[in-house]
Structures are given as C-alpha cells and as structure tokens.
Amino acid sequence: MLKEYLESIKDLTPEKNELAHRSFLQNLLNRLKDHFNKEFKIEHEPKREQGSQPDFRISYQGLNIGYIENKRAGEDLSQLLKSDQILKYLELNPNLMLTDYLNFMWVGKDENNAPLIKKEISIASLDELSKPLKPKPQTERDLIELFKSFFNHEAAPITNAKDFATHLSPRTRYLKDALIKYQEKTQVSSIFNNFKEYLYEELSFEDFSDALAQTLTYSLFLAKLNHPFEKINLDNVRSSIPKNFAVIREMADFLKKLDGIKEIQWLLNEILSSINHVDMDSILKDLNDDKDPYLHFYETFLSAYDPKLRESKGVYYTPDSVVKFIINALDSLLKTHFKDAPLGLKSALDNENIKLLDFATGHRHFFIRSVQKSARNEENK
C-alpha cells in the first residue's frame, strides 16, 4: 500500500499545487480507513476557497469524526497550528490530521484548548522520492496505527444543555461569518432584502446575519426536540418544528435556499451532525420539569453564543416554580387589598379596568401563567 502510494507521487515538488496529487492521497486514505471500518465516509471538497472548509471530512453514519487538511509538499506543518484556519477547524472538531503528502501530524487540543500535536510520522523525504523506493514495513505499520487512532477518536459525550449550547455556538458563529462573506450571493441578499422590507428597514447586514444564523440553528434544535427519534435533515426540518413556532417554521425554509453555497452547506451539516447525535434525553433531563425546554434552551444557547447580546436583550428565563409563586402572591394581593378585584386575577376577566402589563415579556412566561391562573379560578368557581 505505502510503496504504491509513494510511486504515484514520485514527481512531487514544493512548487506544485497541493491539488496536483490529491487523488493519490485520497486513494491512500480510503485504503487506510478500510483497514478499520468500510462504513467510514471520506468526503473531499477540492473546489473551495482557502480556509473555508477542510479538504477532507470523515464521518460515520452522519456523525463527524474528524478533518484532514492537505498542504503543499515541504510546508512546515507545526507552523500552521496557530493559524486562524487550523484554530477554526479544531474549534469545530478537535480531531485533525495535517499532511503535506509525506508527513502526517495528528492534532487535537490540550486542557487549555490550545493545539496539541498528539503524534506525527514521516513516511519519506522529497530526496527519497527521487530514488528507488523501498519503504520499511514498520513505516507502513506506523502509518496504519496513526490512522487507527485518528479514525477511532471519540468526542467527549454531551450530557447537559450547557455543553450542548457551547458545542453549537462556534458553528453558529461561523455560519454568521459565512453569511457575511457571501452577502453578495443572490441566495443571501434576497433573504436580507426581505428582512429589510417586511421587518426592519434600518437593519444592518451584520445584525441580519447574526439573527439569521441563530434562528437557523435554533430551528434545527426545535425540530430535533420535537422529534427526538427522527433524523432531522433539510427536507423534514420545517414539518418537524412545532406549529406554535410559526415564524421559525417559516424561517426554516431559508435552509434549503442557502444549501447551494458550499461553505454554508458544510456548516449546516456540522450543526445537523451535532443535533442528530446528541443524547436528547440527557438534555431534557438537564432542563428538568421547571423549565420549558423549547424556550429555556435559547437562554442557555445565547449565553454561550454571545453573553453580551443575551444581557443587552434581557434573555433570562425565570424558573416555573418562581413564576407560579409570584403569580399566586399577586392573586392573593388583589383579593385582599383591591376592592375591584375580589376574585383576584379572575376579576380581570370581567373588569376592563384591570390590566396586566409585562414590560419585558421575553418568553411570555408570566403572562401565560397569569391567564392560566385566571382560568383555573373561573373553573373552581
């Protein structure tokens, strides 16, 4: 296997574009993965802008396993570790293989989330390529062992809402960046123009892309939450979102429209991969019975995605037990201290002079519980 690969790249030079021998590298990768599991899928994206997405994406039954990034022969791989491109890939998946065809470097992250070289090997030098090739059997065994570790990498399980929100937030940020990057594309500009026409004429493109990226991610989450045992994709996401989230259902239609832009497609697939493979039961248990998971998770997500935005918009979820206590106290106070409300909140149903105002309505939690309390009082009567 190794001798055949080296023979196919004998004319490799630092001057040649990294794409020149990409097909031979892809053949090697396919043979390596077949050593372990033929169900592993290697997706190659040759026509891409520099740094927009990895050269190869490895997945298993839709779950993202890791990335492989191919560089020009002779490039110093260790010098790339602090580049924006590599930091981006590691933030999305801390399982990355760098190669210049002859050297292979397996990279992850340390306890401080900094790039960490886990293992590296060299299978030949450029000088050796120009001579009769006799690779050592041990070199091939070492290469197989390196990729065995890479392919068998298991990400830390996500078992609570906070970790899940932290996992989704960088993908959403990069989705926002991609929307800004491709704002001249008709698929993006037409949505922006609709937002300006029907929602807010003074909307900036950055605010638009931020809001759209959040909404698209959240629409995928809502779809999975509503159908935890169904695989969510761009074809069924709209119908999977609860009907009472009508606006988000409508926004989900934009997902298919944006899917035609490769970098956005890749990021949407990353989000879908995460959502379809998370333990939704653990997320629901973490959110517990005192919280509406459909609404509460947005606060958790926004605190990970952009805590300053969360604070400026006042996105805070009050636990249901606290809301009930406040509503019951208000009901009692009306009965004992206000002659126009002898029946408490129920009196508001018959007296138009009694008004309920919520100055920071947010999830409408207080308002909903107030109406429910009024209705129960009526039923009891």
Predicted feature residues:
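Non-catalytic substrate-recognition/targeting regions of SAM-dependent transferases
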Residues: 248-311
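Class I SAM-dependent transferase core
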Residues: 300-328
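Solvent-exposed, charged/polar functional surfaces in cytosolic regulatory/catalytic domains
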Residues: 31, 35, 194, 198, ...
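Charged, often flexible domain-edge or linker segments that flank or initiate folded functional domains
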Residues: 48-54, 58-267, 316, 322-381
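Short amphipathic alpha-helical interaction patches enriched in hydrophobic/aromatic residues
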Residues: 9-13, 203, 309
